[in-house]
Amino acid sequence: MDRIVIQGGARLEGRIEISGAKNSALKLMAAALLTDEPVILTRMPRLADSRFLGHLLEKLGVEVSDGQDAQLRLHAATIADTFAPYDLVRKMRASFNVLGPLLAREGHARVSLPGGCAIGARPVDLHLKALKALGAQIEISEGYVSAKAPAGGLVGGEIDLPFASVGATEHAMLAASLARGETVIENAAREPEIGDLADCLTAMGATIEGAGSSTIRIQGQSRLSGVTHKVVADRIETATYALAVAAAGGDAVLEGAVLAHNKALWSSMGEAGVTVEAVADGVRVARNGSRLDSVDIETQPFPGFPTDAQAQFMALMSLANGSSVIRETIFENRFMHAPELARLGADITVHGNEAVVRGVERLRGAPVMATDLRASVSLVIAGLAAEGETVVNRVYHLDRGFERLEAKLTGCGARIERLPDGA
């Protein structure tokens, strides 16, 4: 199993190209099931998660081929199978999003309940509620969801989500695009990835209004066409590299990043003493040598502070002047990185969904272990800022969400390398 070795203390200077958003790309891949024409995705991130989903789509009959310049071509000319087995779905919960498209196109599907990061209870109840609102009959047995559409296919309906679930909103949008009539999603998620999916589905022929607001209206079509679509820039990757620059010190441009997609984060970083500004081709982040100020944050659905940047921000606050309070309101059990940051010298106390971070003057390198995707990259950030050598073990988590992480950081001056076991 690979590990990442970091020699801390180097400033980050230069440019980092931001990849397409993983959380958007996976739903766009699932959208290829809605049409018998080719779907071509550009700025497609090359990640373990996208490979996992690609294998599942191939099993369902989709032709999947990589092109040059971060391009992925998917062609579901026919659906060979509507069964998504456990061994393919368990690796990543986003695989569950094939259920709606299969149901909408073929009228039936059987999909395993999902796996993925072990972050609290992340049920699919809202996904199933949305599909039921479109007329689907749902049965759950022995770890599988069996779904059947009414005669004539799914029918538009009213979907009122109890909270703004990103996954349920996206799943409903996918299925509703091939449903008869209008679907209205109330209390819809507002993340930029929702808008990206809406843009793609609209280009395929669906009529969608209100993406980015709490009410989305979808006029389904009997048939959707192929499309070439550029995946939106990854706002979490943007946040991660911005926080890395802030922690290690330096001045870098994040190419392709969209300033408007991380306003809450930029506000907190600015309050801490980090410079963040829009430039012609992205976002510039800079920090001088002075110690940062502590800042309290609370994770919230977009446009609030993103839960997927909480661990990375905690790494930054571990070096700030004073104490900060970090409240996690989205997922339970999402402070698993705190004990590992403590191995590097961080002073963190966790009480339920709240962590108190007492800033220290310096962190010191040590062996640490990644527990999930965002936790693993928070340890990389801390290692970049620490004195001496940090070794991050179990880095397969990183490969699920970050493309060429070591190369991107090395290009800005970081001393970081990946080593296989035994090396």
UniProtKB/Swiss-Prot annotation:
Phosphoenolpyruvate binds at residues 22-23. It is found in: Cytoplasm. The keyword Cell division applies. GO terms for cellular component: cytoplasm. SUPFAM superfamilies: EPT/RTPC-like (SSF55205). Its main location: cytoplasm. Pathway: Cell wall biogenesis; peptidoglycan biosynthesis. Keywords: Cell cycle, Cell division, Cell shape, Cell wall biogenesis/degradation, Cytoplasm, Peptidoglycan synthesis, Pyruvate, Transferase. UDP-N-acetyl-alpha-D-glucosamine binds at residues 93, 122-126, 308, 330. GO terms for molecular function: UDP-N-acetylglucosamine 1-carboxyvinyltransferase activity. CDD domains: UdpNAET. The active site is at 117 (proton donor). Coiled coil: none annotated. It catalyses: phosphoenolpyruvate + UDP-N-acetyl-alpha-D-glucosamine = UDP-N-acetyl-3-O-(1-carboxyvinyl)-alpha-D-glucosamine + phosphate. It holds the Pfam family EPSP_synthase. Cell wall formation. Adds enolpyruvyl to UDP-N-acetylglucosamine. Belongs to the EPSP synthase family. MurA subfamily. This is UDP-N-acetylglucosamine 1-carboxyvinyltransferase. It comes from Maricaulis maris (strain MCS10) (Caulobacter maris). The gene is murA.
